[in-house]
Amino acid sequence: MNKSTSIGKLVKKALIDHKQNDMNSALINIMPAIDSTANKEYGGGVGHRIRSFIRKNEALISIIALGCFVILPKFRYPGKTKSVDFADIIYDNIRTYIVHEGEVGEMIEFNHEKKLAISLTKWSLNENYVLAFILCVIVSDKNANEFIAEDVIINLNFGCFSVNDLWGRRLDLLHHIANNSNGQYRVENSNIVLN
């Protein structure tokens, strides 16, 4: 195969945007791929399926973005009637804003450092969160038949990977991370957990 598939094209554009430090454009390109992937995995309404996809991948996202395992608790913002979690914040302030406004919501900003900073009015995510979202699309088992022309190598803390070698290999990536974590993580029930 030498032509990119439809999800492959979105992934390739998002990777190029990420490399050029254009996180807004990277997210504009990857969010439809997240939705399509989540639809294959969960079906149902768009909010449910995207939140479910992010929740399932939250540990992997944090390891890629921060270099460590972080699952954020639910919390309540002033004026909100229910508690929210990481998936709610991403859906409400990235996906929904992109669809309705064409850009990421003001609550989200990106930094070049390996950190996550949260306040009542601002979430500062490092740029590797965007790369993590892209990788979650790539490794979904529902995307095993995807492909990008002119393969890309992704450098992560735990290795270098060809995008075309990663399609649909979520479990393999989780095992690779666990096996290279000096005993910090293990794979359990198709997810990565702390030892």
Q: Where in the sequence are the language-model features?
A:
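Charged alpha-helical initiation segments
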Residues: M1-L27
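Short runs of predominantly hydrophobic/aromatic residues within well-ordered alpha helices
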Residues: I7, M23-I30, I34, A87-Y91, ...
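Hydrophobic core segments within long, regular secondary-structure runs in both alpha-
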Residues: G8-V11, R51, D92, T96
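Hydrophobic/aromatic-lined pockets within catalytic cores
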Residues: K19, D35-Y42, V99, E103
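Short, contiguous, well-structured surface segments enriched in hydrophobic/aromatic residues
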Residues: I28-I71
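Long, charged low-complexity segments
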Residues: E58-Y129, L135-W167
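Sequence termini and other peripheral, non-core segments
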Residues: N157-N195
